[in-house]
Swiss-Prot record:
Positions bound to Zn(2+) 2: D42, H215
Pfam families tied to this protein: Lactamase_B_2
Cofactor binding mode and count: Binds 2 Zn(2+) ions.
Binding residues annotated for Zn(2+) 1, in chain numbering: H38, H40, H130
Reaction equation(s) it catalyzes: Endonucleolytic cleavage of RNA, removing extra 3' nucleotides from tRNA precursor, generating 3' termini of tRNAs. A 3'-hydroxy group is left at the tRNA terminus and a 5'-phosphoryl group is left at the trailer molecule
Name of the encoding gene: rnz
Keyword presence, Magnesium: no
Organism of this sequence: Mycobacterium leprae (strain TN)
UniProt name for this protein: Putative ribonuclease Z
Family classification: Belongs to the RNase Z family.
Chain spans, region Disordered: 193-220
Length: 220
């Protein structure tokens, strides 16, 4: 999402780079911040691809580091992704004359509090509840009078209410039991479902579920 002149990527789902390439910017290199709500595999499936592609397509001799904001253990995960791409990094440096060093990444780990200052406008005001994964965090991105909350997966909790209070929109993952019927016993453990979305915050004005492409649910 874009806030002012800043472009944020929240979670690295499968296919996120293809979606970014199809957008108006056509490249993930313009992403100024990568925000990670938690370390479930589906949230970081394309993280390694993002690290390499962002690095290669910046086309600069001295590119700034890519900031990644996430929960504890994010730095370890990023390091593992880079290690897995070690041979490719060597190949890319050999092939591209403008690449002199491996990808530069700065990882910031938080569970609550304010992160950055204008024009960044990113705040983490508390953890969310997506057990058994812990900790998980939500992001509130603000630009001028507009604020959008992106929380990943969670169930209603006090910190989510606080994070989403008076926000213009809540972007949130939900699970639909009719789609994942074979694992329905697990569907209500750590995830919202469509009838419960609006319980996340009485003050939020919109929530969009994006867990299953083509099956989005919009709850006013």
């Amino acid at each position: 999402m874009q806030a002012g002149r800043q472009l944020f990527l929240v979670d690295c789902w499968l296919g996120v780079l293809q979606r970014a390439s199809a957008g108006p910017t056509h490249t993930p290199a313009v992403c100024q911040r990568c925000c990670s709500t938690h370390l479930h595999g589906d949230r970081i499936s394309d993280l390694g691809d993002l690290l390499i592609t962002h690095w290669v397509t910046t086309f600069a001799l001295d590119p700034p580091p890519l900031p990644i904001i996430g929960s504890p253990d994010t730095a370890e995960t990023v390091e593992a992704k880079l290690k897995a791409s070690g041979h490719d990094i060597e190949y890319q440096i050999t092939h591209h004359t403008y690449l002199n060093t491996p990808p530069l990444i700065e990882v910031y780990e938080y569970t609550k509090g304010f992160v950055g200052a204008p024009p960044d406008g990113v705040s983490i005001r508390g953890s969310t509840n997506h057990g058994p994964v812990t900790p998980t965090i939500g992001f509130r991105i603000e630009s001028g009078p507009t604020s959008v909350v992106l929380t990943g997966g969670t169930v209603p909790c006090a910190s989510l209410d606080e994070l989403a209070a008076e926000a213009d929109a809540l972007v949130h993952t939900i699970i639909r039991k009719n789609i994942v019927i074979r694992v329905h016993q697990q569907a209500d453990q750590g995830h919202l479902q469509p009838p419960l979305v609006n319980r996340a915050s009485d003050s939020n004005r919109g929530a969009r579920g994006h867990r299953h492409p083509g099956h989005n649910v919009l709850c006013p």
